[in-house]
Amino acid sequence: RAMELGCDVISEKPMTVDEAKCQEILDAIARTGRKLRVTFNYRYSPHATRIRELLRDGAIGTVHQVHFEWVLDTIHGADYFRRWHRDKRNSGGLLVHKATHHFDLVNFWIASRPKTVFAFGDLVFYGRENAERRGVTRFYSRVHGSPQAAGDPFALHLAQNAALKALYLDAEKDDGYLRDQSVFGDGISIEDTM
């Protein structure tokens, strides 16, 4: 709509969530001649911006190659397996949902685009099947209202934190968004090892 009104558009990623809507946006660009910029907010964090400044100022010389690894621990990483991201049909997986920020950071830091990118992944820790292989026998769908969640170090107890309760648990009746699903439940199809 903004392009039809003569405006260029700046969008946070993702610009849309499916192929048909993406095609509508591309058609609007072709039809109106307007511009679209999809941005990544993470590049503007203070440490990311400082890295760019250091590289631009030649602090380590000319960069010829980048090997970039991001280790996502089970404290922050588990969150992706509690929420909507856990189903690859919703998120495209962490290589799409999370790693796009990492690719953008490298492009931002060295003011260049890659000639080759390689990535791979597998699901080896989270999900019911992997938990069963490790001997887990207590399963539950979500933490709230589940006695089986007691003692699970990965359980997110929304009701025990006033801020989380107000932000998320109390809003479920309106948005249906569950943030406390079991990371060892069924329906997890994204990779946890990349």
Locations of the language-model features?
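Sterically constrained small-residue positions within well-ordered secondary structures
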Residues: I29, D57, F108, D186-G187
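Predominantly a Rossmann-like dinucleotide-binding segment in NAD(P)-dependent oxidoreductases
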Residues: R34, Y42-Q181
